[in-house]
Amino acid sequence: MIIEHKMAKEKQETELEITNETDTTTELTVEKQGKELIAQTNLSSSNLIKEFEREQLKKQLPEIYVGDTVKVGVKITEGNKERVQPYEGVVIAKRHGGLHQTITVRRIFQGIGVERVFMLHSPQVASLKVERRGKVRRAKLFYLRDRVGKATRVKQRFDR
């Protein structure tokens, strides 16, 4: 009889544990649903846009400074094929921030200066690598447009 009583008591305890577990999960789901509902009702159009932009940002971008020599891998679609074309040059300007951040890269191709503006978080930019750091004292290096030959070189910086 004592054994039956112990078994009955254990059975009641396990039933209590099971009901307690289901009750807590139900409460948690209700709380989660309540928080989600509150969060959904508080989202305005500007908050939705900010959240969407935050999701679109690339996570693994190197620190880029004006004066750096960078190699940008640009996706190019030719017919059905897609390939990555490297573009290497000196960063002469940085603009904006967040999702719309751009860099202007200048290089000399066959004696002619070529500048391209890249949106850093664009899907067209496949890769971005800093080849060497440049030592400059300006935020914009537009004066390089007027220089020819060796005068367009930027001194190398070793501390970054």
From Swiss-Prot:
For this protein, the record's InterPro entries field holds:
Ribosomal_bL19 (IPR001857), Ribosomal_bL19_CS (IPR018257), Ribosomal_bL19_sf (IPR038657), Translation_prot_SH3-like_sf (IPR008991)
Gene Ontology biological process terms, A to Z: translation
Q: Which keywords does the record carry?
A: Ribonucleoprotein, Ribosomal protein
Among the Pfam families in the record, one is Ribosomal_L19
Residue ranges the record marks as coiled coil: none
> Could you confirm whether the keyword RNA-binding appears in this record?
no
| Gene Ontology terms for molecular function | structural constituent of ribosome
Q: Say which domain of life the source belongs to.
A: Bacteria
Function, as annotated: This protein is located at the 30S-50S ribosomal subunit interface and may play a role in the structure and function of the aminoacyl-tRNA binding site.
* Family affiliation: Belongs to the bacterial ribosomal protein bL19 family.
Entries under PANTHER family matching the protein: LARGE RIBOSOMAL SUBUNIT PROTEIN BL19M, RIBOSOMAL PROTEIN L19
Q: What is this protein called?
A: Large ribosomal subunit protein bL19
What organism is listed for this UniProt entry? Prochlorococcus marinus subsp. pastoris (strain CCMP1986 / NIES-2087 / MED4)
